[in-house]
Amino acid sequence: MNKRDFSELKNSESSEESSLVSSTETVRSSKRNKKFHKNNRQSNSFIISLNFTIRNDDDPFVYMKNPLSEFIKIGNFVYKTKSFVSLDKDYHDDNLDWKISLNRSQYDDVKDFIYDKNRVIVSSFTNEIQSSCFIKVELSTSTHYKFRVTKNELINYIVRTLNGHIVTIDQNIDIHYMGYPMTINIVNIGDDFIGKITGSTDVHFKNIDSNIVVMNQCIDISNKDVSVFLTKCISLNSNHDNNIRFPIIIDKKIINRYVKNTFDDTFTDNDYRTYTCDDIEYTFNIKVIGCNTQTKFKNTYKLLDDSSPIQIKSNTDNVILTSGKKKAKKICFYFQSSNKDSPSDNILFYNDLVDFITSKYNKITCNQSVKYLTGSKEIVLKADFISPHINDNTMYIIDSNTKISFNTDIKSSYFIAHNDKPTEIDTVTFKIKNNASGGLFSLMFGDDDSEKTVIFDSGKLEKTVRSKFPKRTVLKHKASIQYNGVTYQFVVQEIKFKEDSDNKSDNKSDNKSKNHLDKIKKKYTTYGIITSNTNIKFVPAKANKSYVINNSVEQTEISKNPVQELEKYVGGISKELETVVRTLCLSRGILKQEYLARGLRPVKGIILHGPPGTGKTSLSRNLGKILGCEGDRFRLMSGPEIFNKWVGGSESNIRAIFKPAKDAWKKHGDKSPVYMVVIDEIDAMLPSRSGSDGNPVRDSVVNQFLAEMDGLEVFNNLICIGITNRLELLDPATIRSGRFGIHIKIDLPDQEGRVKIFQIHTKKLQELNRLSDDVDISKLAVITEEFSGADIEGMVELASVYSLERLNKLDVINDDVINTHGLVTFEDFTKAAKEINHNKNKSDSTKDNINHMYL
């Protein structure tokens, strides 16, 4: 028997909350209470004052040595009594006759009636009390976790425990049901204040603690009536590398078996349970389809022995559910995320990626991400496509025969190199760009600094790049580097490698392996290294026309045989043009100083005239390449674009043509690099001036151009090439010696020229072995008389399209089919020649009709 000091009990009492009842119910309770006390005063025959002790149990009896009667009354509450002897304990307290034992809930009920420390008035209770048809109770618990109890079983337990006891409203009763502590509070006994519990008394629940889940009936349901969600999946073994182990790809049939094992007994709607297999713990959430959630008591359910599958969905990234499996022949990945802060680490290697995927992932799905760890970075790859594709829920098996590739067309900051060891770089060209950090204001209103001329010293640039740009690099590799306190973006625009064993053919490998390696080399970039012997060049981006790079320290090397170099790109060069090309290159090559010392003036302007399509623009562009005029030092423009609607705007555009060359000449003198400007349709910009009847704006443009080209300011680092179909329309002052003094007619090519043009435009087809054996270029040159270079180029393209159309009609297309049925034949060329002739005749006919209309 647990005895406690009353004063300690009183100090530890917690404040009680009084429940709100309606005014009508308050009046009824008051009347019942007065009636109960009146009857009690008339019938009670014995009243005593006793010391009490408190027990820690849920026994609803009050214990005394010699009970006054079967029931006693303390305050407003009536309790059934038992003798101390029934406790089966030996007591030797002389004052035991004057003591009474209460449990904790009984003490809480009567504590307001305690006086003189720990004494209470006890009276015998002999009134006849009617049996209660029902009682309404509240359930509470002291636990901090949820537990489930069955409604009917709990009611039976309460009735069995309180059978024969008298209860009153607001009485608290402690019970321990299935090991769970609960407190019952009587809130209603019908119309009476007091009642007796019998085996037929019905128990109703009013309020239930949230930690007590009272379940209703158990219902048998089939697998189709439930949905299961896999909410969590964790590893129980800390030694495993979870980044590699997850996500787990598992077939739905296997996970169905796990679910059935997990919910093999009764469960409730929205129940959570765990299942462990192979050190992996799965958490499942089961929901009953069509379950009424707006009920006071939950039903319990049990799955029938059903062979149909359960609807299962994974809500965690750690598990991917699949249906069926298939061996993957080809898988293509793309980069889902990137790290822009580490440009030196953005070069990945094809073989490393393939080895990682095949060794770490033996199965994959369409929607799965692959995490590739390199250094301190995590790179995420995702499957772009899988062949053969069944559906998105299929598990694809990866083995050594699976061909792995990567989509390099999707924009990413990563580069995939086909070679593991870097190849020594002979020459690398960097493009310099503005770092583009001006923000929204610059984007909307422009940046004034972008028009200012910025001159870069190539020597200083080279030192800066060698020290700060990654030595190991690839094409399009970029990094932000400071130069003279300003940050610019340097992009690898072009790379020329030294001859390396990696680029040589391997005679020992079979043709199949060689073809596979060739495809990899074509698709992925080449990994190179910048050494002390690497030649470094710089060109500004097209958007940064005001950037001027001083390459005077290392002059551009001009070929000693420029005509032969030019014939690689242009066919049908005339003798007259050969002479001009040699003169141009001689005055800008290694004999430049000797050329000037003899009093010879470098050629400043050339007019190329002739019918359209004869290659005048192409000739000019390739002539600029031979002279080293690339990037910002080569400008191709159209004559009409020079005109501006604002006063003085056209003249300002003329000055802008000559400004870069003049600025470079002022800084470097005769060591300045060569600039080239090609003006197409120059007759629209420099038309003949017609005195007072002319257009004053056009006349002003001509005057400004002549002043810039041949004015007081001397500079010999600019070559200006004008292109026109109508030489006679040009102003006579522009085509005199010292300005555009050289006039070369580019006419339709002769037969020998057409052969060379065909050789140039069929070069790629020959390299790919896509020309049929019956194709004779000499015969093609014969049947294309009066064809311009543009006509021949269009003819080659059209013939190639014809062969592709034949391929497109076939059901199966592979390398063997292309090599057999995809070759460009002589018939394709003749068909293309007829179509071009037809289009030319149609165009001439239309032109004649238009002339007739005007006449």
Swiss-Prot record:
Keyword hit for ATP-binding: yes
Any Pfam family: AAA
Region described as Disordered: 1-37
An annotated GO BP: SNARE complex disassembly
Biased composition (Basic and acidic residues): 1-13
Record-annotated disulphide pairs: none
Residue positions binding ATP: 610-617
MF terms (GO), sorted A to Z: ATP binding; ATP hydrolysis activity
Stored PANTHER family: VESICLE-FUSING ATPASE (PTHR23078:SF3), VESICULAR-FUSION PROTEIN NSF (PTHR23078)
UniProt similarity note: Belongs to the AAA ATPase family.
Name of the molecule in the record: Putative AAA family ATPase R476
